[in-house]
Amino acid sequence: MAKSIRKRVITVQYISLFVSIILFASSCAVQKAQRSLLNTPALKGAHVGIAVYNDTKGAWIDQHQSDYYYTPASNTKILATYVGLQFLGDSIPGWKMAENADTLFLFPQGDPSFLHPEFSYQPVVDLIQKTNKQVVIATTQSNDRFESMGDGWAWNDYAEDYQPERSRMPVYGNVVHFYDNGKSLQIKPFHFFKNQDIQYEAVKAKQWSRKKSTNDFFVTTQKNSAKYFQVPFVTNPEKDIQLLNDSLHIAKPIQVLKYSPQLAQRTIKTVPTDSLLKIMMSRSDNFYAEQVVLLGSAQLLGRIDDATFMDSLIKTEFNFLPQPMRWADGSGLSRYNLNTPENYVAILKQMQAKFGESRVKNIFEKGGEGTLSAYYKNFPGTLYAKTGTLGGQIALSGFIYTKRQQKLYFSVLVANHMSKTTSAVRKAVEAYLVEIAKRN
């Protein structure tokens, strides 16, 4: 009997020792992977924040400067995704409407899909074209508090396709769409070019731009062989109605609403929320992210006031964060945004718990797709993540399902790197995460 007990004790001791050796080896491997990342030549002089959490085991795997602040760039779109899932329902609450005997009143709420070529479903366009009533649109609301450009944006990027203006009533995505088929140049909307005589041979394979404060478009000396490209236009509530009339060609021209009628309003839902968020995350669409935040503000506050909306969410929806964050816009274009790796891990955990694992997975991009198309193709498991890039800043936050059935949340934020190419930094982060996934 005593011999049997001693045998069991020895067996337990051996098992404990074996487990300890495995854990020690795993810990050493993680530390080695971390050192390899931090010592990468592309990251010389940079600041790197790392947070990796094993949700299956409920334990941190790796942390390095994980409570330090970084400019997260497009990782800010993770917050915009949270807003969309929390406030926008199954389909975008893009408009409100009311009507009386002879007039249809429309109240835009910031829907980015309106007349956007990417979306064939256009319920508001159908409504406008089918009604016999006079259509009037409230293009502004007196208690709105937001600017066409986000706080901290680069002012001289006004003509870049990644920085369209924000508005209560976006039209065509607030950009001019150029289609070059090799024989002709199609422009949509053509509203801004009606007085121009555009000869294709003179503009073929050329880049277009515009003046800073007006919709005066012109061809630059820069080459552009793209078959499709965009240039943002200057939004203006009343002039956008002219653009709308020029596009829809309805019998009774749309008018601007000068007063708010005392009539019951109902919501017009447009495109599926998850479809919009999926596109936003896949190509890191700044315009969609900004408009999602404006839509969220309209839903929660009854007005578009992005600063008040984001401040309110920091105190309520995001009061669980380990560190207080600074949130300046929806897209991450602003360098005023500040966040930590630990915060992103906490946000990702909360999103899956609150909105469902499968729903969140369907919105995030997998390795080898979208902005991750050049990375994580042969990953030991499955990685879902959001990238982020600004000058000197690189970000990647997401979650991993390893081959050993472990779920990991991670965030790697890099500040002030001086690498000539972002790919060198991204490959170093990829090598690190590959090692982490192999060991878990």
Predicted features along the sequence, with ranges:
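Small-residue-rich helix-loop
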Residues: 61-63, 293-440
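Conserved serine DD-peptidase/penicillin-binding transpeptidase domain
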Residues: 86-323, 438-439
